[in-house]
Amino acid sequence: MIEKKESTISTEDAFLVGVVFGNLSSSKVSEHLEELELLAKTAGANVVHRYTQKLNRINPSFFIGPGKAQLIIEQAKSLDVKLIIFDDELSPAQIKNFSNLSNSIKVIDRSSLILEIFSQHAKTKEAKTQVELAQLEYMLPRLTRAWTHLERQMGGIGTRAGAGETQIEVDRRLVRTRISNLKKELDKIDKERETQRKNRKENYKVALAGYT
């Protein structure tokens, strides 16, 4: 049986990154980082440093320039931080490029952080299923070595590599399978809710008939 992965943010020391670009002023980015810090704390992270970078253009490889990317990785290492959170949304390629700079430091963005918070606060079976589905659909195109070895978190049938499969291919297969199963589970929940609604309606009609 495949189980939902545990939180990878809770109790981590975090390094926040904000970018001054376009119409965004330094003060506005500072406000965004204040919000991001609150979100990180809500997820259980301990923010130890905030970094702001002014850009004339977005770098397609790292969002910020490659030199600055290496710099924040080195700063994070010096602070013994394993989690860097960007206020801006990163592309799958940018996530992959950061993972190539360091396997020991995980780089995520605001969207991933918010999904983590939703996951922690989901109470009902349906809410937990919806959040896990959203997390995995977000993760799939961004899957890199930083996300690998999912069999430790999602153990069960189908975790072994087939002929010629790399570990990351196994991980992607695991995620796709889990996404498919979660969608089926949500369909089942919807059908059960509809059946319950119809039953309540019929019971109401029967009860009403008893009074007439």
Locations of the language-model features?
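A charged, well-structured terminal subsegment
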Residues: 133, 137-151
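Short alpha-helix plus adjacent loop in nuclease-associated cores
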Residues: 112-133
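N-terminal accessory targeting/assembly segments
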Residues: 1-114
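Short hinge/gating elements
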Residues: 18-23, 57-61, 115-122, 157-172
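Conserved hydrophobic/aromatic pocket- or pore-lining residues that grip, position, or stack substrates
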Residues: 84, 136, 175
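Conserved G1/Walker A P-loop phosphate-binding module
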Residues: 5-14, 24, 146-212
